[in-house]
Amino acid sequence: MRTGEVAEAVPRVVAILSSLLQRVAERNDAAAAAAAVGEEAAAVSAFQGLTKPAISIGGYLERIFRFANCSPSCYVVAYIYLDRFLRRRPALAVDSFNVHRLLITSVLTAVKFVDDICYNNAYFARVGGISLMEMNYLEVDFLFGIAFDLNVTPAAFASYCAVLQSEMTYLEQPPAVDLPRLHCCPSDQDDAGCHHKQQQQQQQQQQHQLAV
């Protein structure tokens, strides 16, 4: 991919996901500061950093896109995996100290499951600005965190696409009340919990819109 084409080639899902995670991280940063639990939160997970990375969430996602060559679907699947991980670890809140590591690890996991061709962990470690040892450790911790539940049904994919589309609406016209949660369905593994209208035809339409 040529450098001059990167800005136009970045899929919409990257900007939408970065906006969603930015709001969630800022809200949790404020909550942690108000509760004065910074030191306690740092010990919750291996994903927790000691300092906030200088690069923004949006810049970090664009860097991943630029160098990892992920398909747009990977970012939706990474979002699903991240939600599954957080459901199983309710004590962990996405904030500015852990969101970058969570992102690079969830995208790495999604790429390996979704795309036919992907770079190895050493490459992703360089893209993410961490060591190979840390990348390997985070990947294993993440996989155990989601109980190796990597399968994503069409209904679940469509449901999370719908959430990202809602975020796109938020960007265009912010609602009076901020969207409070990162995830959408009570259980994305339960097809009965996802509406039939979000089946394969809608999935194809949503995937096209997010890739534009």
UniProtKB/Swiss-Prot annotation:
GO molecular function, one term: protein kinase binding
Record's keyword terms, sorted: Cell cycle, Cell division, Cyclin
GO BP annotation list: cell division
Pfam families: Cyclin
Superkingdom in the source lineage: Eukaryota
Family: Belongs to the cyclin family. Cyclin U/P subfamily.
Protein name, as recorded: Cyclin-P4-1
Organism: Oryza sativa subsp. japonica
